[in-house]
UniProtKB/Swiss-Prot annotation:
Region feature (Disordered): 221-263
Family, per entry: Belongs to the universal ribosomal protein uL2 family.
One annotated Gene Ontology cellular component of this protein: large ribosomal subunit
Protein name according to UniProt: Large ribosomal subunit protein uL2
A Pfam family annotated for this UniProt entry: Ribosomal_L2_C
PANTHER family assigned: LARGE RIBOSOMAL SUBUNIT PROTEIN UL2M, RIBOSOMAL PROTEIN L2
Summary of the function given for this chain in its UniProt record: One of the primary rRNA binding proteins. Required for association of the 30S and 50S subunits to form the 70S ribosome, for tRNA binding and peptide bond formation. It has been suggested to have peptidyltransferase activity; this is somewhat controversial. Makes several contacts with the 16S rRNA in the 70S ribosome.
Single annotated GO MF: rRNA binding
């Protein structure tokens, strides 16, 4: 893994910082694990914008990543590490002893040729997946399930991890990167280690066009719009003279947005601001 700062041969190259990983596979991805991915432009079936700042971008295939890790007690060998345009983390193509291939999230420290395994009695080793009741307290894990059998939902992006800090009865207590502490059923499965490609946060795209390649459109300030487009719009000068709100009139500075009160009882401590 190397961090490369481009020479200022043009305005678009001046600030570019790239993350170069010579271990990544340079060929095509594994075709049986690809799926089509259509562009929506942020519109729904009525043609109305439901998600702003989306449009254009390079064509992509979706990689079918195994978040469930439900192929139990069958060892697998890492064939190669690959780039995935759909996420910040890299992925690993693994070959199981029975001949099946799957993509998994590539944890930090996983290399080509390493052996991994999923199962109740899998050894405590980077890349192995097992229920959290069998993982020692204090361990660092990623791709953590919230419901048994549903597949990993927490700590899946580059450099992400969760720490197991306690185990009581049927639950384990996790400390998330945000500072939140929450209880999860001990039967839920997690993968040992942290997600790789942690240098992803250090990259600098360097120009607006690099975001357009990724299908991200510009974010326009509300105060630069007309009154018909935003509550902050219109008027002379740049002062909109009211409390900041979203385009739909909801307060935007510090207002709580969480609605799922059903699971509040599992949150031991709220995330830090």
């Amino acid at each position: 893994m190397a961090i490369v700062k481009c020479k200022p041969t043009s305005a678009g190259r001046r600030h570019v910082v790239k993350i170069v990983n010579p271990e990544l596979h340079k060929g095509k991805p594994y075709a049986p694990l690809l799926d089509t991915k259509s562009k929506t432009g942020g519109r729904n079936n009525l043609g109305r914008i439901t998600t702003r700042h989306i449009g254009g971008g390079h064509k992509q295939h979706y990689r079918l990543v195994d978040f469930k890790r439900n192929k139990l007690d069958i060892p697998a060998v890492v064939e190669r590490l690959e780039y995935d345009p759909n996420r910040s983390a890299n992925i690993a193509l693994v070959l199981y002893k029975d001949g099946e291939r799957r993509y998994i999230l590539a944890p930090k420290g996983l290399s080509v040729g390493d052996e991994i395994q999923a199962g109740v009695n899998a050894p405590i080793k980077v890349g192995n997946s097992l229920p959290m009741r069998n993982i020692p307290v204090g361990s660092t894990v990623h791709n953590v399930e919230l419901k048994p059998g549903k597949g990993g939902q927490i700590a899946r992006s580059a450099g992400a991890y969760v720490q197991i800090i306690a185990r009581e009865g049927n639950y384990v207590t996790l400390r998330l990167r945000s500072g939140e502490m929450r209880k999860v059923l001990a039967e839920c499965v997690a993968t040992i280690g942290e997600v790789g490609n942690s240098e992803h946060m250090l990259r600098v795209l360097g120009k607006a066009g690099a975001n357009r390649w990724r299908g991200i459109r510009p974010t326009v300030r509300g105060t630069a719009m007309n009154p018909v487009d935003h509550p902050h719009g219109g008027g002379e000068g740049r002062n909109f003279g009211k409390h900041p709100v979203t385009p739909w009139g909801v307060q935007t500075k510090g207002k709580k947005t969480r609605h799922n009160k059903r699971t509040d009882k599992y949150i031991v401590r709220r995330r830090g601001k």
